[in-house]
């Protein structure tokens, strides 16, 4: 910094519009000058001793850091304004309880030649009459070699020159200094001004007092309009004494602004005085006339100053009350903050103890984790080596198979069985092993490769050996769905298919209460919640077939006889292998009509398919609707839709009579909802049938949830009253049979919901009382399958 640099200090208090106005004025006034250095001053109070003694060193440091951070954030907008103008800036944050003294010392120590400050709220009354505001005290305390600029609303309000001239002028910088008054007061004409050339200072003082009186009167009027009734009473007592003096010269007080004039304002009075002076100059001594004018002026000046003092008194009284209230609030906040600080200190000590304990536990856990990590690394290396060796063996085996079979494209996706194996397993197709006869062939139960399977032997005709049979067999071998009958293998040369065996027969046998054969006992009826679940399973399998890519698969022969049930009454659709892959392009419709006759069972065939021969996914929707009606009623498909519609139209409660009573107590609302879906699916025109994915599946999904809840309640009742589950079926935490068993990292199996809640509150195993190595949970599928099978046996 050069010796000839101009040092300009800008003192700010906070971050508001007043501060921005002060900074903006300083930049506009001094930034264009050469060799100028700006200093941004901010004074913050010192921390009291009472507070510092109650804090610990750590808390005091945190408190100071927080104060410094808030100060930087407060000064940031002002700093950015200086940076934007690309001027040299130093930021000085002073700590002192006396703002004026701190700024004075900074001006003295740094040789500041220009000081820019903001005006206090009460400075509008008078710079000379009120010296108690902060701006005045700063100006008085500042050394005389420094000029002080007082800014209000972005404008220059007052300047204290550095040449020791203490005279100040109170004027609005937007108006020019001229000898004039407003439209209500009139003007002093130039023709009469020569008569008072002997007293120009007198009229200048009258003009200044008039301007000040108007501004102060307006401000006091605003103060009086506010609802401070307790101030008005005291001010009113002063007005009574003042009115006697004002009436002598024609002055009075108005209700709107607090100060007014009767008949004419001060300019009118001034004009009358000039006329009196002019007339008296002819008949009296000029010296005595001038003396009388000075006396009258001094009297009027005292009256105006009296009004100023009373106005400032009212404002000061209001400020004192506000300051007192703020002081009470600050004391209350200080007490609350002290209590809060004490509580925080106690909590901090407790937290330190907990942290120390956790640190010790962490060290122990890290040591244990290190041992586990080393074991895992060794096991991982061994596993990777084993996988690498297995991959090499697999590739070699694959290479040999490709060489033997002529390439990967010729490999079959299903197991090939020799015809002799099938003949031997079925005891030369013994009638004792026959479990069903269909339109395409007979079905036998037998054992192949130590597995119970169902072998369908197609009727021996030429169609079974065509290219279409092999194409459909290839497609079927690639389809996998939980509710589609699984194809295990085939003997393509003889048109034989090998499926997984379904122990509980077909849905038709369970609904119509028919035994598969004479030797088997009568199966129990399906309960209503199982029927809701079966309906959803069939719909999900159909949706899988209909959304197949690149072309949908239509079953064409969907009926209860082709829906099979396993040990747990889980349903699977059979005869998928003889389904039809259709092209939804309308140009192929005639081809389907000419080459394909109606296929399927009469009461389940789509009426439009019967009429046109066109195979579409909606054909399966029609058959599915009939099946839904049979699930609810357990009646024959013939005329079923018509009889149900008739029962629904009857208001005498016949709907409950068509429900299958052997299924238990039906929920009437849900049963009626399923019947309505079935009737919509069985509409005569396919365009009137609902969409499987958007309309049917969401409804059945909701019904399945209702059925799942009812099934669990039914099973729990059986468990509580009649049966005891195996001990490993119970959760160690809830002591109930698990519905979703999961293996935790301690090696024990828990109910998933219960162990998750345990892990949120505890880190030790409820069985071993040792820390969990990790929070991972693995589903125990084998145990879940065993629990489901056990529940199914209970329900049966």
UniProtKB/Swiss-Prot annotation:
Residues 429-700 form the Protein kinase domain. Its EC number is 2.3.2.27, 2.7.11.-. It is an enzyme of class 2 (transferase). Pathway: Protein modification; protein ubiquitination. Keywords: ATP-binding, Coiled coil, Kinase, Nucleotide-binding, Serine/threonine-protein kinase, Transferase, Ubl conjugation pathway. The active site is at residue 557. GO terms for biological process: protein ubiquitination. Residues 171-181 have a biased composition (Basic and acidic residues). SUPFAM superfamilies: Adenine nucleotide alpha hydrolases-like (SSF52402), Protein kinase-like (PK-like) (SSF56112), RING/U-box (SSF57850). Residues 163-195, 218-240, 270-292 are annotated as: Disordered. One of its GO terms (cellular component) is chloroplast. One of its GO terms (molecular function) is protein serine/threonine kinase activity. Residues 724-796 form the U-box domain. ATP binds at residues 435-443, 456. SMART domains: S_TKc, Ubox. InterPro entries: Kinase-like_dom_sf, Prot_kinase_dom, Protein_kinase_ATP_BS, Rossmann-like_a/b/a_fold, Ser/Thr_kinase_AS, U-box_ubiquitin_ligases, Ubox_domain, Znf_RING/FYVE/PHD. Functions as an E3 ubiquitin ligase. Belongs to the protein kinase superfamily. Ser/Thr protein kinase family. This is U-box domain-containing protein 51.
């Amino acid at each position: 910094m050069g010796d000839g640099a101009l040092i300009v200090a800008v003192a700010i208090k906070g971050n508001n519009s007043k501060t921005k106005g002060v900074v903006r004025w300083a930049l506009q006034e001094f930034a264009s000058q050469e060799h100028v250095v700006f200093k941004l001053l901010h004074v913050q109070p010192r921390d009291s001793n009472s507070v510092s003694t109650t804090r610990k060193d750590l808390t005091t440091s945190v408190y100071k850091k927080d104060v410094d951070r808030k100060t930087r954030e407060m000064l940031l907008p002002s700093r950015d304004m200086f940076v934007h103008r690309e001027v040299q800036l130093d930021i000085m944050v002073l700590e002192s309880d006396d703002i004026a003294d701190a700024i004075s010392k900074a001006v003295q120590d740094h040789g500041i030649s220009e000081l820019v400050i903001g005006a206090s709220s009460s400075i509008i009354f008078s710079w000379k009459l009120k010296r108690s505001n902060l701006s005045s005290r700063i100006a008085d305390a500042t050394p005389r070699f420094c000029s002080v600029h007082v800014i209000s609303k972005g404008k220059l309000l007052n300047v204290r020159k550095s040449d020791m001239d203490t005279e100040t002028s109170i004027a609005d910088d937007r108006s020019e200094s001229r000898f004039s008054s407003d439209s209500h007061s009139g003007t002093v004409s130039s023709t009469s001004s020569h008569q008072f050339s002997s007293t120009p200072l007198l009229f200048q003082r009258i003009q200044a007092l008039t301007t000040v009186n108007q501004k102060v009167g307006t401000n006091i009027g605003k103060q009086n309009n506010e609802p401070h009734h307790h101030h008005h009473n005291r001010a009113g007592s002063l007005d009574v004494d003042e009115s006697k003096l004002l009436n002598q010269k024609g002055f009075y007080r108005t209700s709107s602004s607090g100060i007014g004039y009767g008949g004419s304002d001060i300019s009118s009075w001034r004009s009358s005085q000039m006329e009196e002076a002019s007339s008296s100059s002819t008949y009296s001594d000029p010296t005595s006339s001038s003396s009388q004018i000075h006396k009258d002026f001094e009297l009027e000046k005292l009256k105006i100053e009296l009004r100023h003092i009373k106005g400032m008194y009212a404002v000061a009284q209001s400020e004192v009350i506000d300051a007192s209230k703020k002081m009470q609030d600050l004391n209350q906040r200080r007490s609350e903050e002290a209590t809060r600080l004490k509580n925080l200190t106690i909590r901090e000590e407790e937290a330190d103890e907990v942290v120390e304990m956790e640190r010790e536990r962490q060290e122990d856990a890290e040591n244990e984790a290190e041992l586990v990590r080393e074991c895992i690394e060794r096991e991982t290396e061994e596993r990777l080596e084993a996988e690498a060796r297995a991959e090499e063996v697999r590739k070699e085996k694959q290479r040999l198979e490709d060489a033997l079979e002529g390439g990967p494209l010729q490999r079959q996706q299903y197991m090939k069985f020799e015809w002799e194996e099938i003949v031997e397993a079925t005891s030369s197709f013994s009638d004792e092993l026959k479990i069903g006869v269909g339109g395409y062939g007979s079905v036998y139960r037998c054992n192949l490769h130590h597995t119970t399977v169902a072998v369908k032997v197609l009727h021996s005709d030429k169609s079974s050996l065509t290219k279409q049979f092999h194409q459909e067999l290839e497609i079927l071998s690639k389809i996998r769905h939980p509710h589609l009958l699984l194809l295990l293998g085939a003997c393509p040369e003889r048109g034989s298919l090998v499926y997984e065996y379904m122990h509980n027969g077909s849905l038709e046998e369970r609904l119509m209460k028919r035994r598969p054969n004479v030797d088997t006992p009568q199966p129990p009826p399906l309960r209503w919640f199982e029927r809701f679940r079966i309906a959803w399973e069939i719909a999900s399998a159909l949706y899988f077939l209909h959304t197949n890519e690149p072309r949908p698969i239509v079953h064409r022969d969907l009926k209860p006889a082709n829906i099979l049930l396993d040990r747990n009454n889980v349903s699977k659709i059979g005869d998928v292998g003889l389904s039809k892959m259709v092209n939804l392009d309308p140009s192929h419709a005639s081809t389907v009509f000419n080459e394909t006759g109606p296929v399927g069972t009469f009461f389940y065939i789509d009426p439009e398919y019967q009429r046109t021969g066109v195979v579409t996914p909606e054909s399966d929707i029609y058959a599915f609707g009939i099946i839904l009606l049979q699930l609810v009623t357990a009646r024959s498909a013939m005329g079923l839709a018509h009889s149900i519609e008739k029962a629904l139209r009857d208001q005498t409660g016949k709907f409950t009579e068509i429900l299958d009573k052997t299924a238990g107590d039906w929920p009437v609302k849900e049963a009626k909802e399923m019947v309505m879906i079935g009737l919509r699916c069985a509409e005569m025109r396919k365009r009137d049938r609902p969409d499987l994915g958007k309309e049917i599946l969401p409804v059945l999904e909701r019904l399945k949830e209702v059925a799942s809840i009812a099934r669990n309640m039914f099973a729990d009742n059986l468990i509580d009253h009649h049966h005891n589950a195996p001990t490993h079926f119970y959760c160690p935490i809830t002591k109930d049979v698990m519905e979703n068993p999961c293996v935790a990292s301690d090696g024990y199996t828990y109910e998933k919901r219960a162990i998750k809640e345990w892990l949120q509150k505890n880190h030790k195993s409820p069985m071993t009382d040792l820390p969990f190595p990790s929070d991972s949970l693995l589903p125990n599928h084998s145990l879940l399958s065993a629990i489901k099978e056990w529940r199914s046996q209970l329900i049966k």
